[in-house]
């Protein structure tokens, strides 16, 4: 039993296996007690939520252990990279709430990497191979059978040096030759079988222009860049587990070149791998996401149906909700398929705390309060956010003519229908209790107007408002509202596990992933909200104004519903 003065004991969150490894390194005094991580995106596309998991780890452990996390753009393939991607990646990381130490580029080290490659040739660790890509691949062998040595494997060092320099000239022919590390063609690890470390590319680089015609491969540039920068922990996803011995081997060579063989195991980056993020109904391949954009299946990288950070931001996800979701699923050594519903639940929980409550009617039908004075209006006070008193209130105009949701009225209803029906009372939120008296139909039998009478002493805050009425409806004044377009999104794909389906991805697209609803009505306060402001359309879901929205043409994106309707739909 605790006394009044005692503080409750906070439940200590268990460490991830990555944090355990880092704490063990700190306890041993490795790297002088420093913690330095990096997030190394390739600037060939927009970041998606899978990258967000890596970002949360890289920046999170650096912050937790008083270290630093830098950004390094892996810009070793100029055919796919540009500055647009660089700028958007930086914007996404900043939006997620992280601050980097420095910004680096693999291209910063092209001179050092070239020097290292020359050293490897001179010391018999690399050679120029003039075979075709198909021949090289065929000679690699299989995991159970050794590879076959290239006929160029033992070519004279001076010849390889001369050809390597030739690779880096405008006259060289792409695909005519590559530089390969001379390692072990019989190694069970396929990555060790004389990997290609340089290839010819004549596309101008977005930073270095036409200075280079030969570029390092990822495996050759990545570990060395970590080493040049002083990275202590190189954290990546599980597909890089078989790359780790090669990562370490190249750093061994680099330390040997620098004469650091006495302390070859000290002051070097340690590669640690965790499980990547996989989500149901979600494509994570940047190559395929780019194809969706280029082929017009989506409006762009920031289409709200895309799993990109920019798409989620535009849809109305908060950075906190994404971070909370990633924190909830954790980091393991085993790949798993996470339910999209878990992400949406995290979004829903977070937006409940921060979204401003407003009224909007998506499928409107006219409600006339027949005994309300013609031409009279009242300003009703509406709480902006019951979860946060500091958000204050706003006013919503009440009048004789209102819009309500068509589904909130039934001419003949069962006893379990607690919304509007003839002869029954309902409460209009923030306003009065009204009793439905009838409805008007057109020649086709469609209801075009509902009539009701209000109780003048039942206004919110009055004594008459306290009587029990089961149904509460939202509404907007027909004369004090704005017309809007609402975009409702569904899963982009119809299959939960895309990786398990052999069909082409475009065959799996959901033709109903976007539903556009025109002629909706929103209250004036909602019409004034801008992109970036989180809204709850009461009784409907969470929304945000789209960048397409203008004063003359309001557009709102549905972020997520108030409840998980997808689970019910698929039962």
Give the positions of each predicted feature.
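N-terminal acidic, proline/glycine-rich, low-complexity intrinsically disordered segments
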Residues: 1-7
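Conserved short loop/turn motifs at secondary-structure junctions
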Residues: 40-43, 72-80, 102-111, 134, ...
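A glycine-rich helix N-cap at a beta->alpha junction
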Residues: 85-111, 116-119, 124-127
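Substrate/cofactor-recognition hotspot
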Residues: 325-571
